[in-house]
Amino acid sequence: MSEKENNFPPLPKFIPVKPCFYQNFSDEIPVEHQVLVKRIYRLWMFYCATLGVNLIACLAWWIGGGSGTNFGLAFVWLLLFTPCSYVCWFRPVYKAFRADSSFNFMAFFFIFGAQFVLTVIQAIGFSGWGACGWLSAIGFFQYSPGAAVVMLLPAIMFSVSAAMMAIAIMKVHRIYRGAGGSFQKAQTEWNTGTWRNPPSREAQYNNFSGNSLPEYPTVPSYPGSGQWP
């Protein structure tokens, strides 16, 4: 079987950089898990959009009299977390469901859990963190009501992101435990090296079953009517 060509991210042809990953939900993810994995993918997209809105809100915060440090950090968060969140927690959960990989499930739980905690902190909105959360937005109404209204939007979006992350991690954990996943399986994948590029479920089945039967069964050959005894 020929190697699948990478298709994500879908970059324009004039950019001299090729896609880094192959992503196809209907082709690689089991039917019963496709809806959940697609929702986690949309959650990643929503979080990236939240970081973009947060950058605009931090600019309004700065124009309204706030610190420019928040705008600078918001820019760093957008550039850093957009690709890193995809690589560090969406790809692990994608590969986990694609290949039933305990190691990738464990990686997802650990990194996505840290992402959840960070998103909660961003929703709270401590000053100097580069995030327009509830504390920073509400506290800025006395200085610039217009800027504070803009700052409320990322606060709401960060809160929605955190709630969706909590739901996602609970659903994934329930499926993981129900399928018999364990830390011992993750250790086995680590020791054997299969965690780097775990084979799909279809490939695992083919390796296990092998070619037990020929592709086309042999048609029996019978003697002509004159040759029968």
From Swiss-Prot:
Keyword field contains Transmembrane helix: yes
The keyword Protein transport appears for this protein: yes
Region described as Disordered: 208-229
Protein name (record): Secretory carrier-associated membrane protein 4
Phosphothreonine: modified positions: 194
Chief location: membrane
Organism listed in the record: Pongo abelii (Sumatran orangutan)
Gene field: SCAMP4
Single GO BP term: protein transport
Organism superkingdom: Eukaryota
Family of the protein in this entry: Belongs to the SCAMP family.
Cytoplasmic side: 1-39, 170-229
Annotated TM spans: 40-60, 61-81, 105-125, 149-169
